[in-house]
Amino acid sequence: MYLPIFCIFLSVVDSLRILQIVPGFTNSHVLFNYRLAETLRFLGHDVKMWTQMEMAMLDTGNNKLPEGVSEYRIPIHFTDTLKTEGLKVFQSMMFESGDAHDLWWTGQEFKDMRVEACEQMLRHDESVYEDFRKDGFDVAIAHFHDLCPLAIAKKMNVKRVIWITHGTSIYEFSAVQLGLRTIPSTIPHPLSSAGFSQLFLDRVQNTLWHLSLLDFVNLPQNLLVDENLFYREFVGADQDDLWDLAKTTVPSLLINGDRMLDFPRPLPIHIAFSGELGVSKGKKLVMEKWLEDIIEKPSDGLIVFSLGTVSNTTNMPAQMINSFLGAFGKLKTYTILWRMEKSVAGAEKYENLHLVKWLPQKDIMRHPKMKLMIAHGGYNSFLEAAQAGIPAVLMPLFADQKINAKRAQRYGMATVLDKLDLTINNVYGAIKEALKPEYSTNAKKLSAMLSDQVARKPYSALRYSLKLATSPKPSLFTLKSQHLSFLEFHNLDIFSIVLLTAFIVCF
């Protein structure tokens, strides 16, 4: 009985032709996919990228296409001006409260954008699709923001697709496609601030977040229904729809991140954490002279304040700016680098404060003078701080950043700020707390934990997923629950018969 499984793992995945379907929503998405492509090239595979360009927010000048990788960029032009300007609206909203209506509105806009973008891509120049078909791809790797990548892969005659997440969380709509059901009582929702708490109110909040994804926030589950209705009209009722393709062409899911940084949860073998992606260049760290001159100034150490590549700091409210500025003014013995896209009135008064439009953040994190990271709680910043053993002050703005802050707090390496309750004293207090020795000690312990794992080949999860995706018998390791409805999965059909029988007998 073990022979078929043994044969699967005897087969060696040599050079594969891999199609990467990239959701070019943000600079962060593109950067992540470039790192993934670079890793695949390092493993000896041929990679071609299909990148959808939308909302005019990708080219910051910091991303470079990996050597040996080709990319086709398909422009998306929305008919609605509001959707074209969607990034600007979203970037201003993330500094605000984000009430229920804002979250619902964002979900509706995002849903319409995904369906329209999918239609444009599927109706794109047929000669381009023919060129992709000639490449004879073995497998596609795509982000699960919607189901359209399955349609694109099918049109290019790609038989297998690996889902990959952009963040380190599994949303309910992606988990269900792989036969995994989330348990709200024990598994924190990616958008919930409850974290790992199992108190009654926290479990209520967690459950409501899970239920809300039907028609809410930035990834509503009914998006998949609307997209599938369009696809059925596009290909005809006699063809497999997107739900069918999800069940027959997707054998595995990669979660972007390190398992140690997530909350514990049971996962089947075809769902795995990717670990760090990207190839270390092995070069000595060399800073640009202007940056090195700033860092090497005599001080108690370096503090970096950066809110990532998605948020536009020109939209930062005055209250937020003044709170941080005032707090930095009290930290005169530290050198502070503030990644900011506009000038800040009053910043010139502080010799220790330096405003810059861009930073090599990953390199700076490993500089010996680095003491503290102030960030929004994006996964990349969280991962970089954890790997470098640097404590953090996190101020979540949107999406999964609240849960990332909870992850960091769980290890005792971070303090957290509420973006709606900022004062000079609040910010200063959070920074001074995080600068205490115990936070640095905890951060270094976490860094050691990330390094001290079971010995394995580099990029083993990625290698393993490629093996599963190209296996001739994916049914050996995928879950049967992938093909069950909600009623069947929870045995509600059986319970209903039992209850009905009991009711008839008793009454």
UniProtKB/Swiss-Prot annotation:
One Pfam family per UniProt: UDPGT
Chain segments annotated as transmembrane: 379-399
Alphabetical keyword list: Glycoprotein, Glycosyltransferase, Membrane, Signal, Transferase, Transmembrane, Transmembrane helix
SUPFAM superfamilies found in the cross-reference section: UDP-Glycosyltransferase/glycogen phosphorylase
Catalysed reactions listed for this entry: glucuronate acceptor + UDP-alpha-D-glucuronate = acceptor beta-D-glucuronoside + UDP + H(+)
Location, primary (coarse class): membrane
Keyword set includes Glycosyltransferase: yes
GO molecular function: glucuronosyltransferase activity; UDP-glycosyltransferase activity
Location(s) in or outside the cell: Membrane
Signal peptide residue numbers: 1-15
InterPro entries reported for this sequence: UDP-glycosyltransferase, UDP_glucos_trans, UDP_glycos_trans_CS
Topology within the bilayer: Single-pass membrane protein
Origin: domain of life: Eukaryota
Glycosylated residues (UniProt): 312
EC top class named in words: transferase
A GO cellular component entry from the record: membrane
Keyword Membrane included in the entry's annotation: yes
Entry EC number(s): 2.4.1.17
Family of the protein in this entry: Belongs to the UDP-glycosyltransferase family.
Protein name: Putative UDP-glucuronosyltransferase ugt-60
Native species: Caenorhabditis elegans
